[in-house]
Amino acid sequence: MARGITRQVVALGMVLGSLATVTVGDTVAASDNAGERAARVDVRAAREAPAGRKADGVTIRAVSNRKPRFVSGGQVLVRIALPGRLTISDARITNNGERIRPHFERSANGTWIGIIGGMALGTNRIQVEVRTPSGVERATLPVVNHRRRGPVFSGPQQRPFFCETEAFGLDPAERPYCEAPSEVSYQYRTTGGRFAPLSDPTSPPADAATVTVRERELPYVVRIERGTIDRAVYEIAGIYSGRPQPLAGDPGWNSKLVYTFGGGCNGGYHQGAGTGGVVNDLFLSRGYVVASSSLNVLNNNCSPIISAEAAMMVKEHVLETYGPAYHTIGWGGSGGAIQQYDIADAYPQIVDGILPSISFPDPFSTLGPVVDCGLLNDFFEATDVAYSAAQQRTVKGFRDPNTCRAWELSFFNRITATGSCDPAIPVAVRWDAETNPDGVRCSAAEQVANQLGRDPRTGFVRSVLDNVGVQYGLRALQRGTITPAQFIELNRGIGGVDYTGELVDERAVADRAALGRAYAADLVNSGGLGLAQTPVIDLRNYRDAGPDIHTAEWSYVMRQRMIRQGTVGNQVILEFGSNSNEAASTYALDAMDQWLTNIAADDGPGTPGDKIVRNRPRGLGDGCYLANGRRIREELSYRGSGQCPELYPILSNPRLVAGEPLARNALKCQLAPIDFSTYGATFSRAQRAELRSVFPDGVCDHSEPSVGERPPEGAWIDYSDG
């Protein structure tokens, strides 16, 4: 076949949190278990909250990074607790045996906050020693310091790597590290509701709006810091109230952070010219600091692991600039949602709660419809067998018949060698089979080379693309929408892609080594690691009625994976139309803030998962916004019944039509002999022979685990050794 194609919190000392390890005597401390979380966010409750339990002995813990072995930039914000009436002046602090005298401030709960700077690359042993009536007590915090430019845990960095600092107004940078000095600029919010540049933050113009943060009215002036971390350009925005004071608190900050993530999916090799966006009235008007980086945009970097590293490093810098945070909320749609889900699972506590919108579970799971839609579109254009528009739509599964075309036009080139190369990557360095076989390959898989490895025969990243045994149109056949003859012709002519991403007549075959590595790395989001202990409000802006790739079944795909892992009480799905986007976003942000606040205030017994479920705010649960803008509570399920499903019907996609279960976690199915009793259709003897020739090794058996499927190795995997 032919192939074409209002700050509302008080002193920083209110920040509470249990310790992973409490240290008394000569012992070793670990980082926060609850980290930056605090008692309450509203003013009344914050004032009434207890001052905090005094430690029985000396303790030290990292605040700016919950994983002290992954600290970067030569400094770390720490909290020290001392026994009795001792003060920080009574303590002897050393790093690797040498006396240091960093500045500390006393917090409201009696602990001491300070920044340990000047750390050497590698291991630093920060020790606090005090004399008490019972003798000398010590606590030690081992910190492993990494370069600000990275990497930390993501493994060897891509080269070449093209810089784009000038797109952000920063100085030009040199490859491959793309470092540039940080700069601060200012904007203000006008009374007309827009942001405008401002040269002097101490002198806002007459049309400047005001914002109330922590019961204090301030000019709505925004401080924006830009610089480079982990080879990414980062941005941090917060209400300006003078120079940030990490040890004294900032009257313009509510001590909470929103971290934004951007969409897309592409192969990297460049810095990126945008972030997830930080100048956002929804967040800033409530007193949040907002942060992001260019490597937190999946279209610049389709690796959730690199994104996790960049987010961790940028967040560390935020906390060392502004001080401890109560919690961090993730935000972003599409590829931004992928990063939230995947980081929450594989690198938990970088974000404490997530607000994914128009979500997908992970990049690999979206490969199915990307490839399938390219193949199906090509097949239906080339075949001599007639398929009606209704039959084609049923085979593809989407509500809108053009959704498959949208998938193909948006992302099919991301599996090819050079079809999606960013303009920042010079043509001269790009791969060419004849003239530049060692050149840059731009496929999205390039971003996970450290996890999957390379095929030594081709130099390409080992592929997880596979459609062997996939019975395209199976559900359509079983429902009588297509005939056995059409089913046979479809599966005979569908073809696949080769290692360069080009359409070929043969079906795609995954690299078996890549399959096992993908599952081990949690690149197929299991939903069973950190995500099981992360509050989730999945914002499903319903777009199925048009040719849009962001179809609603994906929220339920992720839910099904979480159900398979034994819990879904931490996920809320909220469906709405475009007319309710602002209302839904505002509600979800405030609800998540309250949810995290409630959890932090819960000192009762139970697992983290128990606390998530029992501290969900009253009124928060599955539901939707009706056409009149009213939000209703209604338990949601895939293809369930009720007012919400009637208003927002959920359909399918090509792999679900082909019989794959809702969890959609099979990269390559195991095979079983054809069983004609499962089709609900009559095949002639000749047709049976034809179908067996189409599937000589059998068809997908979804009652068995996927080939290579295994539990992930765990959270916080370090790929530093390559």
Map each language-model feature to its residues.
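C-terminal His-loop and adjacent cap/lid subdomain of alpha/beta-hydrolase
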Residues: 35-722
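Secretory targeting and sorting signals
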Residues: 2-31
